[in-house]
Amino acid sequence: MLLSDALAVAVETLSWMEIEGLSERQALARSSNQLGIKDLGSLRLAQRLVLESTRRQNLIEKLLELADPSLTYQSLKAGPRSFARIYTYWTVVKNVDWNDAVAFLKAGRKLLGWRELAPLELTFGKLLGFRPESALTDASDSESIALKTFHPKWYVEYCVKMFGRSNAIAILNADKTPPPTYIRVNTLAEDESTIVEKMKRDGIELDKIKGMKYVYGLSRSRGLPPFSKFVRSGEIQVQDKSSCYTALAAKPKPGSVVFDVCAAPGAKTSFLAQLMRNRGTIYSFDISERRIAIWKKEMKRMRVNIAQPFLADARQSLPLNIEADVLVLDPPCSNSGTFAKTPSAKWRIKLTDFKRFSQIQLQMLNQCANQVRLGGRLVYSTCSISVEENEKVIETFLGLDPRFSLVEIEPEIGKTGMKGLSKCRRLYPQLDECNGYFLAAMIRKAY
């Protein structure tokens, strides 16, 4: 039953991801609700099947092609195509025994019908004799790296060009495994030490992150139940270390006027409010009504009472004639720093997306700059590792607007920026055990 339910959810999830471009999390939630499957064991297995088969999409498609060169994978219906990906992961990558492979195939036939899978039966049989290394025969260097690290070939070539071969391979390999889970203890709910002690009594092991106020890592082996009582009560926020870094770098003071631009779903807003001790005003802007609705729920859960939401497109003037002491901009980006957590993102983006996003980011930065008071702080962050979306955006912005200059960021974690921007900070998944990230802090000065 567990395998059948998990497989049903996984196949449906992959199909929704492909048809509507949903993320793994969105598609999994939709599929489990649609099918009425709530068993946690089945959902965990479904999540693993989805994440790991999506992570290895290029390797899996190569193995399917080798098993049957006449097979046109993209011509298959969504259901059989999704099952073929999952089956290849299960039998070749996990290297299960013959009995497990047969049981898996039987579950697939029951789910989709034997007629739907009949064109793939020969392919499925051949795959039992394959190993992942089978896909590397006659591959070029960049193709081999792409298949070994599970990335598009163009992205491998981009990383090698930007970071050098050895650093690139380290970055790419880091995407194979999601980083640790981090939490932020919410002192708007209760005293930090009290919350930490309560969690420890419940058997949750925490590691304080050096130099980062209120931020803790969770033991990889124990993890955190997704709907634990501490999350529901607002005592903690599950938030990547990199995201927490933005709020700390902003250095908001109690009583400040803060703009949080592209703010939803609200993790940064709530941390800014925490650092301000719920004193002052935060104006949070986002373009999505749906995300603003989530933001409102998050502010209530996290005990934030100084933040106001505004529906706005940050590429245009913000709808407030007020100057900010601190403005935080976390614009849309390629998400190339989050491939370990959201592997589907790496198969959606193209090289040209780096330039496309950089144009949007620069447009937003130019608009936001006009809202920062003299002596005020402007913080820019992305969860991308591309130079185009980070150093080149900042370099261009500073060239266009001499009112701003870079300042040192505290705490000083990660590495310095590229292209000589030593005051910017970069976080790398293989070094910092978090999402890939970029951060720049600037002060508005007199001309």
Could you say what each language-model-derived stretch is?
Residues 255-262, 283:
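Conserved class I S-adenosyl-L-methionine
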Residues 1-223:
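Class I Rossmann-like S-adenosyl-L-methionine
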Residues 315-328, 332-334, 340-341, 355, ...:
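C-terminal catalytic and target-recognition region of SAM-dependent MTase-like enzymes
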Residues 287, 345-373:
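Glycine-rich S-adenosyl-L-methionine
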Residues 222-257:
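SAM-dependent Rossmann-like transferase core, predominantly class I methyltransferases
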Residues 276-277, 372-374:
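Helix-to-beta-strand junctions that scaffold the AdoMet/dcAdoMet cofactor pocket
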Residues 285-322:
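S-adenosyl-L-methionine
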Residues 269-273:
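Conserved SAM-dependent methyltransferase scaffold
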